[in-house]
């Protein structure tokens, strides 16, 4: 026997002994659970942030883009290319074969398009190949040129209306407002120390706000005074800065500021303002933007807790809902809002700043009547008996349009048809005049001590753009480029009297190049970290505030990187990189989910009459905004078998405070103490005894561990190891 063969035999013998020892050791070891808490909620699927989002894109997102872009008409409006349907074919290779061949795991996308000649009435329908579209594997990755890539979810500021304040050198509060759409022109309001209010349109030069109000159609001084109840700040703006006297003057003045150097006319100014704000193709709120606008600009949030100075009557019936002198609860304020009432008068306390004879600044509070204007949106469920989601209505609707529909419809079928037909009017995708007037009213109300400024770092004001939405945005860019090409071809071929077909008009190159560009060069499209199963899983659950439309690491301040109370159970306070990206890249917590608007939710058990509901089917998922003000018990609070609290005082959390309250005041309870941490941090045994800096390093270094050839169970574990391995699907 040669030395080499002897070495091989010895090696095999050692392996057999080791294998036998491992088997006998594993059969002897019994897992002991030292946890004091039983009945913790089972972890959700840990890669669903990726898979669910891509599934939404395939089923709904891609169709939304087609419906937004089509129909495409030529300049004479004689030809129209309409969208009928779209589908994915089977992929040429499966994911494994794509890796072997260094190919893209993709499926052909086909769209059925209809070309209508309005002159002749001729209609041609055919299926058009729209390019190969990359598909997501079951494990939440894409295979591009044989390599697995992950699209990292992006954490961005949500579209909405945000108010802030700063103090001038005399200590006076100066307010600012920013109206942010998902896509389109920004509106920014600001005031100076002389109580003059300005507006910036699309980050251009500032304009007196009364000039802007006139340009929108409220032309004379009397109309402005009537609409905003003789507000002294608007009066000061008119006296000191506004030289215009009617709508025509204001339109020309606005156009000069927005388009300096171009000849100003009333028509061109009207067209420009209409394109900036009231064209759904240029100004897009999306569902989440409309939700945030309605939440902020509804009349209820400003009326609650204030005393009415005039009676409030239902416009439709004339019935007095509430008399003057009533201090409104939130439910009563919601009743006023859902009755379609856009304005009400309440008692307010405004600050007035004086300089005393000794030269000191003095503040006096003066009681006054303030007018509150809302945006006229109501809950449609209060007016119809059927579910409107199937009709395309999932948000609050414009009361004026709903009233028209209700008055004209004579049967339920007619009502359903009218609601479906006018869904875009009921829930506008762009900003409307009522929204703009409500934003100005809120700004003036803040000066009178009504309403609150916003915390921009609160997770209720930040949302997740996950893979489906990022792909949809890229797809829309490609389609917008393609739309121009189609329109030009329509005109050329119509002039040459060529035989037109949908295939001849469509050029797919802009769409395919936009998608390739995204997967190849976007900072959010990254090679998957494949050191070990944990590295793969955390990469798919990563949240980045960087990337297009996000922050830049050079300009991001301390506040945006810091841990915020609203991160609890949503974003891990521990796992983040060291170095320039600290706080800008983070990880989802173990139980966190993303709702259909893109806001992060975390689960809680309900607590009613001091009894915790231990049924896992009755868990409630709340976003950071919904959780505000709630008193939430800790997940390790000791309970009796019937779900009642053992102790007569319970440690709780309420926003940024940690009160100790009797059980009767507790509203919700954490589902598990692990809820606060990410997957990597949850794998650290006895995490609560670790120093935070060491835990941060540990959770990052676990991703760099070299995996064993033959995997072993950990001697000390936290109980989630099995699911981490299963969900990483390696």
Q: What residues fall within each predicted segment?
A:
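N-terminal non-catalytic structural scaffold regions of very large proteins
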Residues: 2-541, 589-708
